From Swiss-Prot:
Keywords: Ribonucleoprotein, Ribosomal protein. InterPro entries: Ribosomal_Su5_D2-typ_SF (IPR020568), Ribosomal_uS9 (IPR000754), Ribosomal_uS9_bac/plastid (IPR023035), Ribosomal_uS9_CS (IPR020574), Ribsml_uS5_D2-typ_fold_subgr (IPR014721). It comes from the Bacteria. Belongs to the universal ribosomal protein uS9 family. GO terms for molecular function: RNA binding; structural constituent of ribosome. This is Small ribosomal subunit protein uS9. The lineage of its organism: Bacteria, Pseudomonadati, Campylobacterota, Epsilonproteobacteria, Campylobacterales. The keyword Lipid biosynthesis does not apply. GO terms for cellular component: cytosolic small ribosomal subunit. SUPFAM superfamilies: Ribosomal protein S5 domain 2-like. GO terms for biological process: translation.
Length: 129
């Protein structure tokens, strides 16, 4: 089959994902998953979750380019992008991935700082007198 393109997002991170049928290779920013993340097993599991749920670990090749944010947000953006790419690759994966919430964009992001306050919600100490 042809290459499929999808994007995933989380916080300020964006992941561009290309998926094609193959033998299970996964490269993120030109590196293997182990080289990119080092010893973060929980983050590796999050990236691989859509492939594990859809049982496609060894049947597709994936190339991911990530921009912005930290490792955790980039990993979640990659997970979102891989899920969307699987659905674009074959529509039957939608019914498999949807119950796990893998196709839903996590809209939580940092709340902006307001003027007159120290942070988004933290006020300066109140003095009664």
């Amino acid at each position: 089959m042809a290459k499929v393109y999808a994007t995933g997002r989380r916080k300020t991170s964006i992941a561009k994902v290309w998926l094609e049928s193959g033998n299970g290779q996964l490269t993120i920013n030109g590196q293997t998953l182990d080289a990119w993340l080092g010893g973060h097993e929980s983050i590796k599991k999050r990236v691989m979750q859509p492939l594990n749920v859809a049982k496609q670990e060894t049947s597709v090749n994936i190339i991911v380019k990530t921009l912005g944010g930290g490792y955790s947000a980039q990993a979640d953006a990659a997970r979102h992008g891989i899920s969307r790419a699987l659905v674009a690759f074959d529509e039957q994966f939608r019914t498999i991935l949807k119950p796990y919430g893998l196709l839903t964009r996590d809209s939580r992001s940092v709340e902006r700082k307001k003027f007159g306050k120290k942070k988004a919600r933290k006020s300066s100490q109140f003095s009664k007198r």
